[in-house]
């Protein structure tokens, strides 16, 4: 049964879904990494595809920008289509001088200036954390591929152009590795819905140093992150 935002039929989605923000990235992942992939939804041009990776059925779908957008799609995927695992694959801006552009961050947890998780807990704080098994798989996959990654907390913001510039220094002092716009929302949806989630983030820009990747570097590093995400997906037992 379709939802207001997803037109797929029952069974069209695999139980594991990779979610980039950009729907064109979803098409790219489908074309480059999946075998026998087909488009399963295109409502509002938020494209979704299902195929196989090394024989394991996997889906990929865009989630748009920000906590509200990813929350809508993740909720409908989990509750209507039976998705059990969602892996966000996106970009982030580094907050620490110890973190370099091109690095991939395994987001073990996410603070946020969004109010969505407090709404879930009637005004109380919620520990928005990744599924431990998924995070461990990502670290192990990176080690096998000899790909340096970092594991640690990130900060999810509702504002891309944030007026409180002093916040960055505070976050860095507290050990937050990077800022992005969706992970805390995804982890909240997963916890509320009994699903599991992980955020894998490529450092595309450095907020402190001003360094950023070239378009070619972004593509290459993005591919390395997708390979890690697919390794994590492939290791998930089929239901």
Curated annotation (Swiss-Prot):
The residues that the entry says bind a purine D-ribonucleoside are: 5, 180-182, 204-205
Function comment: Catalyzes the reversible phosphorolytic breakdown of the N-glycosidic bond in the beta-(deoxy)ribonucleoside molecules, with the formation of the corresponding free purine bases and pentose-1-phosphate.
* Site for Important for catalytic activity, residues: 218
Q: Which HAMAP family match?
A: Pur_nucleosid_phosp (MF_01627)
What are the annotated GO cellular component locations?
A: cytosol
> Is Transferase found in the keyword set?
yes
Report the Gene3D superfamilies cross-referenced here: Nucleoside phosphorylase domain (3.40.50.1580)
- The broad enzyme category this protein falls into is transferase
Binding locations of phosphate: 21, 25, 44, 88-91
What family does the database annotate? Belongs to the PNP/UDP phosphorylase family.
EC id: 2.4.2.1
GO molecular function terms attached to this record: purine-nucleoside phosphorylase activity
Q: What is this protein called?
A: Purine nucleoside phosphorylase DeoD-type
Q: Which reaction does it catalyse?
A: a purine D-ribonucleoside + phosphate = a purine nucleobase + alpha-D-ribose 1-phosphate; a purine 2'-deoxy-D-ribonucleoside + phosphate = a purine nucleobase + 2-deoxy-alpha-D-ribose 1-phosphate
InterPro entries assigned: DeoD-type (IPR004402), Nucleoside_phosphorylase_CS (IPR018016), Nucleoside_phosphorylase_d (IPR000845), Nucleoside_phosphorylase_sf (IPR035994)
Q: Name one GO biological process term.
A: purine nucleoside catabolic process
Q: Which domain of life is it from?
A: Bacteria
Give the positions the UniProt entry annotates as the active site. 205
What binding partners and quaternary form does the record give?
A: Homohexamer; trimer of homodimers.
Pfam families, sorted: PNP_UDP_1
The UniProt keyword set, sorted, is:
Glycosyltransferase, Transferase
Recite the lineage of the species.
Bacteria, Pseudomonadati, Myxococcota, Myxococcia, Myxococcales
